[in-house]
Each structure stands twice: as structure tokens, then as C-alpha cells.
């Protein structure tokens, strides 16, 4: 099963993430957990989140990039849900062997993240990749949708279909 942990502070303003979720939602065995919908008060139900994670073979962290990082509720979710003794540390093997995909949207163009005056995309992903590896997850190459503020609807739809194809390809290879 694919579990999408979706964190968008302003989902009603989203164009790209909305289309990505619509495409992903057409696949079988996909569960979408919208953190800002579930936890508007930031009071995360850790047991429910850990239960959802335990059912998944592929975990997707999907969100818009905010200040070169994750939205605040996703960071809190990581702090609360990925606990010692469950996700890492002595006895913390609940996530071992599962796959993790970072699916991120950005307002800037892909060249904005080239090494130079701004951090490279590989550099920006390091904290998430380190978290994944520390929890025994298998890090997959990220899916990024760039220039989302200026993309026309056809381009957004095409990129959202690419996202769906990425998830479908994972399902076909992993029978999940």
C-alpha cells in the first residue's frame, strides 16, 4: 500500500499538489492522509499515524517547499510519530525495509536549485534522506514539480500524470 503523508498549510490555494493528489487518488491501494485537515490544532494522533505507517510499503512525504524545507506540521509529525523504540533506536524497526519518496512542489525553476547562488536540490534533501535512512527506510529519488506558481493548467496536469506514473511504476515493481 502507498501512504501519502500530505502537508500543505493552505490546500485550498494549491494548484499543483491538488492535481498530484487527484492523480494519485485514482490508483488502487493508495491512502492519503492530509495532515492540515486531520490536525488543524497540531495535536497529532501518534498511534493513528503509526498504524497507518505500519500498513504502508511506500511512504510519500508530499508538500510544497517552504523556505527550503518542509511545512511546520510535517516537521512536527516527524518529531512526534517517528519515535525512539518504534522508528529508530533499540527495538525501533517498524519502518525497516519500507520505501520513502519525497514528492515536493516548488515555486522556483529547476535551475534555481543548481549549485551556485542557491543550495542544490541534493543538499536540500539531505535532512529528509538522513531521517529516512536513520529509520531504516529505503530512500527513493525525489519527485519534484518546479515552477508551480507560473505553470499553466496543461503543464500542471502533465506533471501530475508523471507523478501518478512514478507511483504506478513503483506498484508494478513492488507488487504493492
UniProtKB/Swiss-Prot annotation:
| Its EC number(s) | 1.6.5.2
Any Pfam family hit: Flavodoxin_2
Where on the tree of life does the source sit, at the highest rank?
Bacteria
User: Which keywords does this Swiss-Prot/TrEMBL entry list?
Assistant: Cell inner membrane, Cell membrane, Flavoprotein, FMN, Membrane, NAD, Oxidoreductase
Q: Can you state the subunit structure given in the record? A: Homodimer. Interacts with KefC.
What name appears for this protein in its UniProt entry? Glutathione-regulated potassium-efflux system ancillary protein KefF
| Cofactor needs | FMN
Which residues hold FMN?
8, 14-17, 65-68, 105-108
Against PANTHER family, the record matches this protein to:
GLUTATHIONE-REGULATED POTASSIUM-EFFLUX SYSTEM ANCILLARY PROTEIN KEFF (PTHR47307:SF2), GLUTATHIONE-REGULATED POTASSIUM-EFFLUX SYSTEM ANCILLARY PROTEIN KEFG (PTHR47307)
Q: Topology relative to the membrane, per the entry? A: Peripheral membrane protein
Any one Gene Ontology MF annotation carried by this entry is: electron transfer activity
Q: Catalyses which reaction?
A: a quinone + NADH + H(+) = a quinol + NAD(+); a quinone + NADPH + H(+) = a quinol + NADP(+)
The compartments listed are: Cell inner membrane
Function of the protein: Regulatory subunit of a potassium efflux system that confers protection against electrophiles. Required for full activity of KefC. Shows redox enzymatic activity, but this enzymatic activity is not required for activation of KefC.
Work out whether the entry's keyword set contains Oxidoreductase: yes
- Tell me which species this is from: Salmonella typhimurium (strain LT2 / SGSC1412 / ATCC 700720)
CC per GO annotation: plasma membrane
Q: Which NCBIfam families match?
A: PRK00871.1 (NF002044)
Family from the record: Belongs to the NAD(P)H dehydrogenase (quinone) family. KefF subfamily.
| Chief subcellular location | membrane
Q: Which GO terms describe its biological process?
A: positive regulation of potassium ion transmembrane transport; potassium ion transport
Taxonomic placement: Bacteria, Pseudomonadati, Pseudomonadota, Gammaproteobacteria, Enterobacterales
Amino acid at each position: 500500500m502507498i501512504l501519502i503523508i500530505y502537508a500543505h498549510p493552505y490546500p485550498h490555494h494549491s494548484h499543483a499538489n491538488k492535481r498530484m493528489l487527484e492523480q494519485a487518488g485514482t490508483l488502487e491501494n493508495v491512502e492519503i492522509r492530509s495532515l492540515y485537515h486531520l490536525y488543524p490544532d497540531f495535536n497529532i494522533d501518534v498511534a493513528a499515524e503509526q498504524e497507518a505507517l505500519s500498513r504502508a510499503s511506500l511512504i510519500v512525504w508530499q508538500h510544497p517547499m517552504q523556505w527550503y524545507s518542509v511545512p511546520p506540521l510535517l516537521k512536527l509529525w516527524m518529531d512526534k510519530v517517528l519515535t525512539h523504540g518504534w522508528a529508530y533506536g533499540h527495538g525501533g524497526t517498524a519502518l525497516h525495509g519500507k520505501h520513502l519518496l519525497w514528492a515536493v512542489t516548488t515555486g522556483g525553476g529547476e535551475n534555481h536549485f543548481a549549485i551556485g547562488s542557491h543550495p542544490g536540490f541534493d543538499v536540500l534533501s539531505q535532512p529528509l534522506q538522513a531521517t529516512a535512512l536513520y529509520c531504516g527506510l529505503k530512500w527513493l529519488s525525489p519527485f519534484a514539480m518546479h515552477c508551480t506558481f507560473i505553470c499553466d493548467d496543461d503543464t500542471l496536469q502533465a506533471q501530475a500524470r508523471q507523478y501518478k506514473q512514478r507511483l504506478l511504476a513503483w506498484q508494478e515493481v513492488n507488487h504493492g
